[in-house]
Structure formats: structure tokens, C-alpha cells
Amino acid sequence: MCIRDRSLEIYWKKALEQTRLSIDDESLYPLKTDIITSDLYEKDDFIIRKLDTSKFNKKKIYGPKQNPFCPWEKILEIDKIGDNHQLILNKYPVQKGHILLITNKWKPQNGWLDINDWRAIQQVNKDTSGLWFFNSSPIAGASQPHRHFQLLRRSKGEISCPREKWFLELNSYQDLDSKLKKNIIVSKFNFLENPSCLFEFYLELCKKLGLGDPISDKKPIHPYNILITNKWIAIIKRKNDHIHGFSINGLGFAGYLLVTENSNINYLKKFGPEKLLESFV
């Protein structure tokens, strides 16, 4: 495995360069949003954005139905990762340099992750790290059935997400009736472990959360999200994908909510973001 110096952030620099080229080529469509947190919520553990649809071309956004990762657009290409994965830009980024790690051949998004996936994630993270998230199926917020992981780069010392403190304190949370706690498992995480250890740890957490086991189940028996940082990992068991006009993927549980013209703002203001998340587990 190629070991990269984290301080170099070669993948991140390539992502920024390809972002510039892709925007010039009109191959990238950054989603324009406005932060409206203060209008709806008083705390700082969520960031609420409203999607600006004034330049939102639905035909372009949803595009053709063929697999966009097979083949992927060459102008979005960042680097090859091992023998089985490719690093590319997200065509519809939520932040600058929004990175996707995809399998270079078809693998289902809703299947069990394997050791090669964890080896590839680890290789990228040794160079460029941040908030990783994975959505296992449409119910968990996945937009494509081809296996892909997403990375939002974070600088050294930067908080990974608004809900980080909540995740770190979840295991000491005393409310045994908490619907979120019953459907989320969180643990300390060490990216320096051997990839086989990361893979086995993932399977262990899935089993504890009631997602099944690859020995007896062909695929996880519930949709789920994964959040990964340099310090912790969380897996969220999912039940719904669209409620009160909101669609939630892994980023929603990390504390990033997106409001669209269909979202029930009054519900969000009355009950708050955490109550909204409970509807999705």
C-alpha cells in the first residue's frame, strides 16, 4: 500500500485542481445554499441550509439513468486507489472539493462492505482526512446503487461535524428511551489499525446494531448510514428516507440539514432538528 504524508494532502490538492477544471468545463454543478440556522434554531449542534433553486436545473441534476460511475467522467478523476477503487469529485458537491471514493467495477451499495473498501478508505485518509459518510441504500439517502463513499475534507484541528460532541457523549447518555440512542452505535475508531481489523470492527458494530452478519445474511437486513472520523465511527440504522418534506442521509445525522421548497419549516421550528431525526430511525 502506498503510504502518503498526511501533511502533503496530495488527493486534496488534486481535488481542488480538478474542481477548477471541471467548473470551467461545466462538468461540475455546486449546489448553492444559504445558511438559515438562526431563523429556525438557537443551538449550534446543527447547521441548516436552504437550497437555492433559482439556478437549479432538474434535468441536469438528475441526469441520465445510466450508472454515472461506470464509466466515471474523466474530468472528475482525482486518482486511482489500489486495484479496486477510484477517487473522483462529486458532480453535485455540498462543499468545495467534495470527494467520492467509488469501486472501479460494479459493486452494490446495499451489500456488505469488504476488506478492500476499508483498505481504500484507509489509504485516502492517510493523505486527506475529514468526515466520511456512507449511505447504504435509497432509504438511507443513497442516490446511486453503485458503491461509493463520500469524504468532506477537514483541516487539522477542525471539528468534523456539528454533532461531534453529541456522538462522543452518546454512550454516557442516560435517556434509555431515546429513539436515536436505540438505533445508533458509536465507538472510538483508529484509522491506523490493519484494514482487516477495520473490516472486522465494522462487522462487529453492524451485528450489535441488528444489521445482521454476512455469514447468515446476503446483505445487511436494514438500511444504514456510516459516519467516520479520525476519532470515532457511528452507524445509524434507518427506517424512513423522506418525512415532513425532508430527505436525510448520513450528513443529516452529522448535523447538516438541507431545507427545500417542499420542507415543512413549521415542523422543524416547533419540534427541532433532533426530533426530526427521530422520524428517520
Q: What feature does the model see in each segment?
A:
Residues 130-143, 147, 214-229:
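A short glycine-rich, hydrophobically flanked beta-strand micro-motif that places a catalytic Asp/Glu
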Residues 4-113, 155-281:
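Active-site microenvironments that recognize anionic phosphate/pyrophosphate groups
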Residues 126-129, 154:
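Hydrophobic/aromatic-lined pockets within catalytic cores
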Residues 86-91, 121, 132-141:
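Catalytic micro-motifs at enzyme active sites that drive phosphoryl/nucleotidyl and oxygen chemistry
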